[in-house]
Design a protein with these regions (language model features):
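Intrinsically disordered, low-complexity segments enriched in serine/proline and basic residues
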Residues: 6, 30-33
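Compositionally biased low-complexity segments, especially N-terminal hydrophobic helices
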Residues: 8-9, 333
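Fe-S-dependent hydro-lyases/dehydratases of central metabolism
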Residues: 34-452
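Nucleotide/pyrophosphate-binding catalytic subdomain
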Residues: 26
Length: 452
């Protein structure tokens, strides 16, 4: 292992991890056997990082390749870092720091938190993306800060989106992040893997968001708790990166620790303009052991809508068509990319959004905003009656703006529809794809995009 992180000494069946520069000794006992079957992608990544054969169920201390904090979770993580005796972070170049949830600052407390994080970044020589770049997960991906075989942690539950790049990426709490900031490593219980096998081509105006909502309906909100979802099959092998990001992003909505797409030509073509990355073969062995395997054929998949107040309560759009809405939100780290916005524009055509509702569109990052601007999409949306905002999380987490009053209904392309997620606990949030959102915004009610 890289001694920069820690040294590993194996004594019989006991692993002793020593963090250089600290009086810190970690003991971990693997529970799996060495004569097991082939390995999953998750097991292979941890084996590479730990320098020995690792199996699901093993508890290991593993180095991380990147650690992300934002304006909500970052301040507490930093305070925990100091409470643990931290003076200098383990590696400033591996820490990703930015603001996206409450930007521009919508309260004095938010402004103070951002000042605190700016001062920390300056003192620690950490590059600060600040509030300029967009939503954390989109920024990590488009800056090439996640790559195949890496372990990335983030103080945000949707960190699992980086699995679209072939990384093992997972969300952690602020206490764990404080530890990571100091030591550059973290304890993990290596998860079992559920293989999601897909086949078929998407029908017209049906796409990755509909697929992942249907998978959530099938697996359930806790059906993949502390497991990795491995997305495979010809549907994924032909899926572009934006769709893979959408699916990996929502792995956590089934309780998963991570979502991973085996890296391929699409992955490396995406990364090559963003960073130098060595191509590695990273796929599960034919004889790997899976906790479960599920098969999904998208050939006849209908547009999906998740009804309040859980993501796994997805139904075919026809079951809720005609439901009046007060607001349509198009954006978030799940569906705020250029491809999503282009789909919205295609459904919109020469039409205009229903004037009885609010339509909020937020590109996921500055780069995605500029792509849409150059393509004429922003002007088209504004002309049609939408409010187009600067890249940020917006209404998704009930933050700075776009909140719902009691009794109001939102249709959203985001990833969660929990009670109170976008404002009042007496409001209702439905989740859908960009195509369904656009069609519904035209008529002020949930609408099947195939009928527009």
């Amino acid at each position: 292992l890289d001694a920069k992180y820690f040294a590993v000494i194996t004594l019989s069946n006991l692993t002793c991890s020593v963090v250089p520069g600290h009086n810190f000794l970690i003991l971990a006992c693997p529970i799996s056997t060495e004569n097991a079957m082939g390995a999953t992608i998750a097991e292979k990544i941890f084996s590479l990082k730990c320098g020995r054969k690792i199996r699901s169920g093993d508890v290991v201390m593993a180095p991380v390749d990147g650690a992300m904090i934002h304006d909500i979770t970052g301040p507490l993580a930093i305070r925990n870092f100091f409470e643990m005796g931290g003076a200098r972070v383990f590696d400033p170049g591996r820490i990703i720091l930015l603001f996206d949830h409450q930007v521009p600052a919508d309260s004095i407390a938010a402004a103070e938190n951002q000042v605190f994080m700016r001062e920390f970044a300056n003192h620690q020589d950490i590059h600060n993306y600040d509030l300029r770049e967009g939503i954390c997960h989109q920024v990590v991906m488009e800056k090439g800060l996640a790559a195949p075989g890496e372990i990335i942690v983030g103080a945000d539950s949707h960190t699992c989106m980086y699995g679209a790049a072939g990384a093992f990426a997972t969300g952690i709490g602020s206490t764990d992040m404080g530890f990571v900031l100091k030591f550059g490593a973290l304890y993990f219980r290596v998860p079992e893997t559920i293989r999601i096998q897909t086949t078929g081509r998407f029908p017209w105006r049906v796409g990755p968001k509909d697929l992942i909502l249907s998978i959530a309906r099938n697996i359930g909100a806790d059906g993949a708790t502390y497991q990795a979802l491995e997305f495979t099959g010809d549907t994924f092998s032909s899926m572009e990166m934006d769709g893979r990001m959408t699916c990996c992003n929502m792995a956590v909505e089934m309780g998963a620790k991570a979502g991973i797409v085996p890296p391929d030509d699409i992955t490396y073509n995406y990364l090559k303009s963003r960073r130098d990355v060595k191509r590695v073969t990273l796929e599960s062995d034919p004889d790997a052991s899976f906790a479960d395997q599920r098969m999904y054929d998208v050939t006849d998949l209908a547009p999906q809508v998740a009804v309040p107040h859980n993501v796994d309560l997805a139904v075919d759009v026809g079951e809720v068509a005609g439901t009046p809405v007060d607001q349509v939100f198009i954006g978030s780290c799940t569906n705020g990319r250029f491809e999503d916005l282009a789909e919205v524009a295609e459904v919109l055509g020469d039409g205009a959004f229903d004037t009885s509702i609010r339509v909020i569109i937020i590109p996921a990052s500055r780069d995605e905003y500029l792509k849409a601007l150059r393509a004429g999409l922003i002007e088209r949306f504004v002309t049609a009656g939408a409010l187009v905002e600067a890249p940020c999380c917006g209404p998704c987490m009930g933050g700075a703006f776009g909140l719902l009053a009691p009794g109001e209904v939102s249709l959203s392309t985001s990833n969660r529809n929990f009670r109170g997620r976008q404002g009042s606990t007496e409001a209702s949030v439905y989740l859908c794809s960009p195509a369904t959102a656009a069609a519904s915004a035209l008529y002020g009610e949930i609408t099947d995009p195939r009928e527009v």
